[in-house]
Amino acid sequence: MCIRDSFFFGDLASGGALVRGGKLKAFIPGGVSAPWFGPDQLDVPLGQDEVANQASMLGSGSIVVFDEATCPVRAAWRITKFFSRESCGQCTPCREGSGWLERIMYRLEHGGGRIEDIDLLLDLCDNISPGLLWPPQQTTICVLGPSIPSSIHSAIKMFRDEFVAHATNDGCTYA
């Protein structure tokens, strides 16, 4: 069975729309700690090895879906905010890195961002999880730290133009 055939995607298998009527923009195959997938990856088989071969993971087993009305910058900021709050503070990369990432994402989302913030985010992500490899390199006591960069890195990789628009248009352009 591939991801497209999972119950969550409803009639996407026949080219239909998501439940709210929008078209698929992106999805996360294994909860918010996993790298994002695009619509072209709906036919990836729903198995640990197959998803790992596409540089992601099934993780918690939840599939997070974004339709065309979803702002990827806002989604990545909210996920980063969650991870920042979950950090126990014991490890420096997680404690310092998650807070810094959250503040930069907040700036981009709320109108204070700069174009340089995009590359700064990627640099910080690389410092938390060196090389941004999958599976992530362990730089902290637990796996929370190396999971934090996944959403930001994926969102920038897939939707860099939307990050640029946030940095140059005083924040989010979505309603």
Where in this protein do the model-derived segments appear?
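Redox cofactor-anchoring modules in respiratory/redox and cofactor-processing assemblies
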Residues: 4-175
